[in-house]
Amino acid sequence: MAEIAESKNFIHAFIEEDIAEGGRFAGQTVHTRFPPEPNGYLHIGHCKALIIDFGTAEKFGGLCNLRMDDTNPTKEDVEFVDAIKEDIRWLGFDWGDRFYFGSDYFEKDYEYAVELIKKGLAYVCELTPDQFKEYRGDLNTPAISPFRDRPIEESLDLFARMRAGEFEDNQYTLRAKIDLASGNFNMRDPVIYRIRHMHHHRQGNKWCIYPMYDFAHPIQDALEGITHSLCSLEFENHRPLYNWVVENVSVPHHPRQIEFARLGIDHTVLSKRKLRALVENGYVSGWDDPRMPTLCGLRRRGYTPKSIRNFCDRVGVAKSPNTIEYGFLEYCLREDLNETAQRVMAVLKPIKLTITNYPEGQSETFEIENNPNDPEAGTRTITFSRDLWIEADDFLAEPVPKYKRLYPQGPECRLKGAYIISCTGCVKDENGNVTEVLATYDPDSRGGDPADGRKVKGATIHWVDANNCADAEVRQYSNLFDDSDPDAAGKDFLACLNPNSLEILTGCKVETSLKDAKAPASYQFMRLGYFCPDNKDSSADHLVFNRSVSLKDSYKPNN
């Protein structure tokens, strides 16, 4: 199979310069962090950032912290904290004893804000949100704040009273004093603290003022000894503010911020707001619906950690935004499962096949290889009898051109691993529907090879012993969105939903070896695709399998 060329990682090149002799971090351990906001489940877009953060530390023999960015009190939830930790562990990464919350630093954030006020580098402002926008200025007009020259002692007093809860939400803010005429609007005296009388999931009601991300984040990085703060490209214009903060407060370290492009994938949305709308409005069954791009959804669908890590590694690290084909993600999964998944036989749309010249009441067994790509995977025993299940579309009463499966007086076909058969006819009900296919077998073709060496012109088809099988429900998934770019500006993403993204098949027939199948096992249903037991709904009493990916590969990699 063709390999995908790995993009050159410019982040690694920067770090190599930094840790080389004479570099800004020469002799230091590379230290990164992954700072998710615990207000939703991680998705494949976060996964790229996660793998860059943890993978970079891994490459350079360094450390990576896990820090929950819970500075915003309105959205955080312990449920999401636990789910994020589970997802990271599932991917094979470990933060050791370096697990933190942004809210752990609230007291230090406050102290550094007071330090800025005392240095004349921050002031309490009384502009309302509407006035703030009105006085923001434009590229040719500086911003304005009539409170910029407020005396230091007055700002210190007001800021202390803000913390004490004396004022209403938005009545006051604390702003950094930088440059009201800057061409970078992030530097036009940005708000670094605002009043929010809200319950915090960890701090309770202890705080009613909260630091802005652009202020808290660089301080948290510096206090944790982060050398390289890796973040997505939308923070590129925030880097001057990041540097300003660490240069003007008394932190022990000055990290370097490096930006990379976010991951975009066609036929999906990665906005938490839009994903939440899909869940809350019932378009999907939950955050872990196998059609969702969340890691828990991908895991439930049967994606493996190796396939996701390979996908992110091969996409590489870019400076410019790009959109990757969903087919490439499927390609990486298919590549992994082709090497590891056990081959089994399952019939999703069954019709009865009767071998009319096979002795009634007789049964025999065959040894079938579990994976032709892995001899160490061994074999398994399956049973064979007169009565079998085959796929309904493996028979046609009246064949079409080039059809090489079963039809009356058609070519001989192989039953996978068993015998060669010839179709002799069928049985129909009163409405003309085929209810049973009839065939004879060649007793001298055990294993699928005729004794006389004749060429078998028909297809090889899979089957299941009707007298020794299990029933199953099978869920076949396809793209959640018909539109390749449902996230495009001006589009109603809900109008782009694919009404046929889920097909549920009941009464499917599978080998008895699958009776005890449990997630995260993966199987190749021969000729059909790769499937896994559903990690929520499948049980010994009610088997449920999800199609992870089809056998057919629509993605064409570059050589």
Question: Residue spans of the language-model regions?
Answer:
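A glycine-rich helix N-cap at a beta->alpha junction
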Residues: F80-F106, Y112-A113, G120-A122
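N-terminal catalytic cores of NTP/NDP-binding nucleotidyl/phosphoryl-transfer enzymes
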Residues: S7-E16, A20-K85, H199-S232
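Short, solvent-exposed loop/turn and secondary-structure capping segments
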Residues: I44, E76-E79, T128, N186, ...
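Secondary-structure transition/capping motifs at alpha-helix termini
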Residues: E21-A26, G55-L63, R89-G96, A222, ...
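Conserved short loop/turn motifs at secondary-structure junctions
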Residues: P36-P38, R67-K75, D97-E107, D130-Q131, ...
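Long, charged, mostly alpha-helical binding arms that flank functional sites
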Residues: H253-C332, D336
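Core subunits and conserved enzymes of cellular information-processing
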Residues: F235-R239, N243-V245, K306-R309, D313-V315, ...
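Active-site cores that bind ATP or allylic diphosphates and position pyrophosphate for catalysis
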Residues: L66, D70-N72, E115-L275, L333, ...
